[in-house]
Amino acid sequence: MNKQSVRDVELQGKKVFCRVDFNVPMKDGVVTDDTRIRAALPTIQLLAEKGARIILASHLGRPKGEVVEELRLDPVAARLQELLGKPVAKVNVAHGPEAEQAANELKDGDVLLLENVRFYPGEEKNDPELAKAFASLADVYVNDAFGAAHRAHASTEGIAHHVTAVAGLLMEKELEVLGKALSNPERPFTAIIGGAKVKDKIGVIENLLDKVDNLIIGGGLAYTFIKAQGHEIGKSLLEADKMDLALSFMEKAKEKGVNFYVPQDAIVADDFSNDANTKAVDIDQIPADWEALDIGPKTRETYRNVIQSSKLVIWNGPMGVFELDAFAGGTKAVAEALADANDTYSVIGGGDSAAAVEKFGLANQMSHISTGGGASLEFMEGKALPGVVALNDK
């Protein structure tokens, strides 16, 4: 990583504005999944060890620039306090006199959590005045919110222009793992691209075709490829305007010597529900009024073999409608193949893939689960992430 990190700077007695990603699910004022809070702990603990006065900032949900009571960060402060085992102060603003006073009262190693930064309309507009106001609270800026690194907002990008700006440990790890995967991968290198829409994955497929040895396609987007090959797909998901593009990807793979895998069979259903009638059929046998909602057993076996023979696998997007148990088998098979592949470094690209490995209880058997859905996707597209670009170079 060519950016400075929190390890590279002297922080004793300094006020540090640390942007974290505490955008966690809540129910009735209680955090229901604290994964993202836990992910930030190493950075917070290192800041405390280095004697910093820690000012944490995060967004939560989409309050659209106004105060939404149920999107206040108080439940997050409560959970963070439990995890850290020490007090976490909380203010109801993210800048201004009240925030300044709380920041000035901090002692070395103390922790303060500011209010939801998206309560301010200037946050998502990257308003320079708001960025300056955030910066005025601190001596150093640490960005540990990889999940928001693809956004140029006041607390993720604007602030970095006003104070020393460095990466947190989580940000550093994400950039190192994803960076190495894309620039200097161990081979064979396999990418598994799933999800519903071709249009969401065009950039990723384009960028990865230049880098991978194997490209595996699954999920709803696969049926546009299958239709483009001349097969009937019944009522399966189709983006007719992307069929030419799908063909061109397959051609490009051939030219580059990349093995391009699409499903050879599918689980089809007569209805989009858990209690639909289902059957496994070869890909050219999908009945006219049924839809394919998962990859079939032959495809699972093929994909498993490719995964097992790979040194590096990046996975972004499920193989089927894994939220419904009847169509979760393909996604589970891929997750299990990754869990069983001892010599394979597995990178799970956030979002639905991360949710899937959690659901199947296999998360701790993956080498790296990215904390950023959109951010890891844009990184894999080869795009520069504004929140990273703004940090100080080494």
Swiss-Prot record:
Documented EC number(s): 2.7.2.3
Top-level taxonomic group: Bacteria
GO molecular function, one term: phosphoglycerate kinase activity
Enzyme class: transferase
Location within or outside the cell: Cytoplasm
Pathway terms, separated by semicolons: Carbohydrate degradation; glycolysis; pyruvate from D-glyceraldehyde 3-phosphate: step 2/5
InterPro entries assigned to the protein according to its UniProt record, in alphabetical order: Phosphoglycerate_kinase, Phosphoglycerate_kinase_CS, Phosphoglycerate_kinase_N, Phosphoglycerate_kinase_sf
Modified residues (Phosphothreonine): 299
One biological process term in Gene Ontology: glycolytic process
Keyword Nucleotide-binding assigned: yes
Heme keyword on record: no
PTM annotation (Phosphoserine): residues: 183
Binding site for ATP: 201, 323, 350-353
Complex and partners: Monomer.
Entries under PANTHER family matching the protein: PHOSPHOGLYCERATE KINASE (PTHR11406), PHOSPHOGLYCERATE KINASE 1, CHLOROPLASTIC-RELATED (PTHR11406:SF23)
The protein's name: Phosphoglycerate kinase
